[in-house]
């Protein structure tokens, strides 16, 4: 469960290292975001000499959460960290690689480009 002021790791090579959620896209007063939700975030830490810089406002899609995700078949998935992938306005990832495992549910939310870049889909 991601809410405003939550810090997230960045799971791609876009140049950002850490994000802080400032808004959840989709509803005016949603409190929590889950896997597959798009958020507005600010970059808190970035790699030097990369296109994305610190204090830049970006959109990101959540790919991993510490909070459990329960599937219809009864399987429960939980990750060790909260992570997101930086995307552009069309929903395409800004980076060219995705690090770590991501959930299969992203395919249902039409983030197929992120799923194809991921090394492991759970």
UniProtKB/Swiss-Prot annotation:
Concerning InterPro entries, the annotation shows: Ribosomal_uL14, Ribosomal_uL14_bac-type, Ribosomal_uL14_CS, Ribosomal_uL14_sf
Would the keyword RNA-binding turn up in this protein's UniProt record? yes
Where does it reside?
A: Plastid, Chloroplast
* This protein's UniProt keywords: Chloroplast, Plastid, Ribonucleoprotein, Ribosomal protein, RNA-binding, rRNA-binding
Among the GO molecular function terms of this UniProt record, one is:
structural constituent of ribosome
A single GO cellular-component term on record: chloroplast
Q: What PANTHER family does this protein map onto?
A: 50S/60S RIBOSOMAL PROTEIN L14/L23, LARGE RIBOSOMAL SUBUNIT PROTEIN UL14M
Instruction: Specify the protein name.
Output: Large ribosomal subunit protein uL14c
Q: Which organism is it from?
A: Helianthus annuus
Q: Which gene encodes it?
A: rpl14
